[in-house]
Amino acid sequence: MVKIRLARHGSKKRPFYQIVVSDSRNARDGRFLENVGFFNPVASGKAEKLRLNIDRIEHWKNVGAELSERVQALVKAEKKNLQTAS
């Protein structure tokens, strides 16, 4: 099964997550099919905290990919921010 999930990068106590499309059998930080964004929970100042490629996420959802709980929450928040910004 294909999943859209977070892959952890960064150093100890400074997490940085890539949002990737991956086969569920692969390791969390292992091989992936496509990188569709990133999430930086410890961003400060003007650093970008979240970037998502919504078009590609929707494409993968239509193909049958399943989103992890955290990615679902991030996508929902990003869509809400886009609606209020317009």
UniProtKB/Swiss-Prot annotation:
It comes from Hamiltonella defensa subsp. Acyrthosiphon pisum (strain 5AT). It comes from the Bacteria. Belongs to the bacterial ribosomal protein bS16 family. GO terms for molecular function: structural constituent of ribosome. The keyword Ribonucleoprotein applies. GO terms for biological process: translation. GO terms for cellular component: cytoplasm; small ribosomal subunit. SUPFAM superfamilies: Ribosomal protein S16. Keywords: Ribonucleoprotein, Ribosomal protein. This is Small ribosomal subunit protein bS16. NCBIfam families: S16.
